[in-house]
Amino acid sequence: MSLAVRVIPCLDVDAGRVVKGVHFENLKDAGDPVELAAEYYRQGADEITFLDVTASSSHRNTMIDVVSRTAEQVFIPMTVGGGVRTPEDVDSLLRCGADKVGVNTAAINDPSLISRVADRFGNQVLVLSVDARREKGEQHTQSGFEVTTMGGRKSTGIDAIWWVKRAEQLGAGEILLNSMDADGTKEGFDLEMIRAVRKEVKIPIIASGGAGKVEDFPPAIEAGADAVLAASVFHYGILTIADVKAELKKHGYTVR
């Protein structure tokens, strides 16, 4: 793999504050997303992902404020997702300093959103966020992986592999593949899911969900991911960005 593997911390932001515990002794306020993003920038993160978990219109301006303040201190690509429903939402986030914008539920409800955003701003701006899991109960998908919404609580019955292929055709520039089964388990990424998606799409895949120790990261790249994303292992200080990069390098992967 010639391109450098990207290591991306993810910050879940609720009403302007980071949620999921954060333990950094050197931060005045571990709940402030701008301070935390700056800390990860100092640690050598390749990108930062913000997920607006409130994502209601009432908090949209709060997120715009967070992004614009972060852009003044952090000089690596920033992706912002959560509650993005229209090309106008994308426009306002790009104007305040985001480099890429993540879409999820709105694209499931109206797939034309993908092509409208890609046509207006370019494919490189659009990250399709997919919360997928092994099917449960009544749902039967061809691949055995289905797309969920509402943080994995709501089944859609949509085949996850079919959906990523369709999104690529419509103009998505990248897939943020989050395994709802692995999420929070700290038992490693869902390698089978990554392989299944890699077989079907050419665009970059960001693997998310399940990172618990440094050894979890190289297998995700081996399975076909181009980047790795994690939240709690970084927030709790279990691992640093440098730890992950050193492990990837040890396995022969290029890192920045």
Swiss-Prot record:
One Pfam family hit: His_biosynth
Key words of the record: Amino-acid biosynthesis, Cytoplasm, Histidine biosynthesis, Lyase
Molecular functions (GO terms): imidazoleglycerol-phosphate synthase activity; lyase activity
EC number: 4.3.2.10
Record carries keyword Cytoplasm: yes
Enzyme class name: lyase
Pathway: Amino-acid biosynthesis; L-histidine biosynthesis; L-histidine from 5-phospho-alpha-D-ribose 1-diphosphate: step 5/9
This protein's GO CC annotations: cytoplasm
CDD domains: HisF
Domain of life: Bacteria
Catalytic residues (positions): D12, D131
Reaction(s) catalysed by this chain's protein: 5-[(5-phospho-1-deoxy-D-ribulos-1-ylimino)methylamino]-1-(5-phospho-beta-D-ribosyl)imidazole-4-carboxamide + L-glutamine = D-erythro-1-(imidazol-4-yl)glycerol 3-phosphate + 5-amino-1-(5-phospho-beta-D-ribosyl)imidazole-4-carboxamide + L-glutamate + H(+)
Intracellular or extracellular location(s): Cytoplasm
Keyword Cytoplasm attached: yes
UniProt record similarity statement: Belongs to the HisA/HisF family.
Assembly behavior: Heterodimer of HisH and HisF.
Job of this protein: IGPS catalyzes the conversion of PRFAR and glutamine to IGP, AICAR and glutamate. The HisF subunit catalyzes the cyclization activity that produces IGP and AICAR from PRFAR using the ammonia provided by the HisH subunit.
Protein name according to UniProt: Imidazole glycerol phosphate synthase subunit HisF
Gene name per UniProt: hisF
